[in-house]
Amino acid sequence: MTALINSTVEYEAGQSQQAFAAMTDAGAHTIFTLATKPWSATTGFEYAVVPYGIATGGVISPAAAAGNNNVDVAAFTAYAPGMTGASATTGLISVSAATNIAATRGTTNGYRITSITVDSTGTVVAVSGTESTAFSETRGAAGGPPLIPVGSIEIGQVRFSSITAAVVASTEIYQVVGTHQERYDYPVWSEDPIRGQVTFSSALPLIHTGSVAKKVMARVATPIYAVIEPARNWKPADVSNSASSEQYYNHKTVGSFTTSQGQASFDVSLNDGVSDAVLAKMGLNLLWRYKPDLYRAPYQITQGVGSIARTNTAGASPTATITISVQQPSVDFAS
């Protein structure tokens, strides 16, 4: 049992901006994590989670020059922070239209799929699959779409069923999102800035070399904390349940419950109640760290907007209760 003698409450007094970094697949291809956490959400330092993928444009069409086996790709934008020419702050890259991109036909068996991609240099490139006697939907299999390099984005596919050179038909071009094309916003995801992770609504397809998912990157700012003292009575933002019931005929009762998100709060003794540094942080979405013992590893993180209720009692130091309105519960960390 710990006596709360050396506890501290700290607030996000500043931020340290980080460059884009790759997030790690937790194993099920739905949750991706970043070792750097928690993430600031205050104005000017908002975090950006950027899965690789097409944002706008990129329509593939039979080559206007009508060359055999060739396609054109309309200009497009994509999110790919590690790609040559991408913005260092947003991860967005603009790629010019490409013409006469050659898809590959089989030499013996007619069924062959070519992926039309943009590679890590921002260049539109065709990646050929292996020919077969029939199409397959298995990546890397004979007759299937190829595994494309890590750091590339799939724009679409060209599917040939004949070895005879010919002008590409529009029916041989496929760009269904999630099957033949990678979009940055599919599948959708939720973000947990305190834990430093994102969760996708479904598993990311394993279409890249090594049977891995597309890259997911994040640009975040980490907090620089300042201690608030003297402080006491820290209350985390916990979730609570409340039960209710309704009475029906024949002594029947139907119960129900609701879940609500609580606020965090703590009390603080102020210097003059006017010029204290923490007062300037009210109304901002900040990270708050509570340590039960400043000499030990465990801590708790809360993220939310602070508000203050001050009391100025004659003959005493001004005091205040700071309440933190949150969007998610406080999170406990062992280290």
Residue ranges of model-derived segments:
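Short beta-strand and beta-hairpin "edge-sheet" elements
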Residues: 289-334
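Beta-strand-rich solenoidal segments
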Residues: 1-224
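A general secondary-structure signal for short beta-strands and their flanking turns/coil
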Residues: 111-113, 153, 213, 259-263, ...
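Short amphipathic beta-strand/extended segments with alternating polar/hydrophobic composition
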Residues: 88-91, 127-129, 227-230, 297-306
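Short, acidic/charged, Gly/Pro-enriched secondary-structure junctions
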Residues: 114-119, 269-302
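Charged, amphipathic alpha-helical segments
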Residues: 88-102, 261-277
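Solvent-exposed edge beta-strands and adjacent loop segments
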Residues: 215-267, 303-318
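Beta-strand secondary-structure signal
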Residues: 115, 157, 263-267, 287, ...
